[in-house]
């Protein structure tokens, strides 16, 4: 799909995501894309697999769900804020997307498949050079106490794209909806001790307190993790269209780095993790380490 007009498609995405509280028409999207309403809608669906108005509805419902979870405003106020005409209209749309009513979700706040707007764009567009220059990397040590982790396993995946091929790309949205999460969702590479037979090395999960007891969606499980020291590597901010290069550059640096220079060594018994690649903060990945014995 590299032939599609990336800037026009992302301009429509940006417009939708910054106008969740306002009515949107195809004519408005056509104006920001530079194409006719028909052609703009066709390009959007060809690139992202759904129509722009469906994309807008999913974004509105997901934003409203997080507000239901975290705020105390009346359900009707939230419905009207996100351009639903009535409590009944909002309830029908909410139940259709998430499988439960807004009131039930507010009361129980179970994990639900929050829609995560994904940025359209090829990994390395034509005319964009690979990131070959040396860039600074920030390294820090962090301590994680014993905790649990809600995970969704695959069968054979060793990295993100294989994982999405096996289980789909909705897992991150479910993990991001967990109210009790101790941090943001992450991709994890698990050592054998954390992998039941026939399951993948790469999984996605989110850390929660050890006493987490809410029901889990089908296919998810609760995995306990012991206290662990991590060495976290963070690259410089990058253009989102170059996320593949940013990941490759940081992973190459991690392989070349020797933790012994600060008195540590890699811990093969601990998981490694990656956070969502976001250009404005740089790519972040961490390895498990343990302190060298004197």
What are the language-model segments listed below?
Residues 1, 42-48:
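Short, Lys/Arg-enriched N-terminal segment that forms or immediately precedes the first helix
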Residues 10, 14-27, 46-82, 108-129:
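Terminal helix-turn-helix DNA-binding modules in bacterial transcription factors
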Residues 69, 88, 92-294:
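A solvent-exposed interaction/effector surface
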């Amino acid at each position: 799909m590299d032939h599609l007009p990336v800037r026009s498609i992302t301009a429509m995405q940006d417009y939708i995501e910054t106008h969740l509280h306002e009515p949107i028409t195809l004519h408005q999207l056509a104006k920001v894309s530079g194409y006719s309403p028909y052609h703009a809608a066709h390009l959007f669906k060809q690139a992202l697999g759904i129509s722009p108005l469906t994309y807008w509805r999913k974004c509105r419902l997901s934003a409203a769900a997080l507000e239901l979870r975290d705020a105390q405003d009346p359900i009707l106020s939230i419905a009207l804020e996100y351009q639903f005409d009535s409590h009944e209209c909002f309830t029908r749309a909410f139940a259709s997307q998430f499988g439960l009513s807004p009131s039930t979700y507010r009361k129980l706040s179970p994990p639900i498949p929050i829609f995560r707007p994904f940025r359209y764009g090829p990994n390395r567009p034509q005319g964009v050079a690979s990131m070959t220059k040396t860039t600074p990397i920030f390294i820090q040590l962090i301590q994680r106490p014993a905790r649990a982790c809600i995970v969704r396993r695959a069968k054979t995946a060793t990295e993100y794209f294989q994982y999405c091929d096996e289980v789909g790309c909705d897992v991150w949205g479910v993990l991001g909806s967990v109210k009790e999460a101790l941090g943001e969702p992450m991709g994890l590479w698990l050592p054998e001790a954390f992998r039941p037979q026939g399951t993948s090395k790469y999984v996605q999960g989110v850390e929660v307190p050890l006493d987490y007891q809410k029901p889990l969606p089908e296919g998810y499980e609760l995995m306990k993790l012991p206290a662990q020291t991590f060495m976290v590597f963070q690259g410089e901010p990058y253009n989102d269209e170059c996320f593949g290069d940013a990941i490759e550059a940081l992973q190459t640096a991690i392989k070349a780095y020797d933790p012994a220079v600060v008195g540590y060594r890699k811990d093969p018994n601990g998981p490694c993790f990656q956070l969502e690649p976001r250009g404005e903060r740089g790519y972040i990945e961490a390895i498990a380490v343990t302190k060298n014995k004197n």
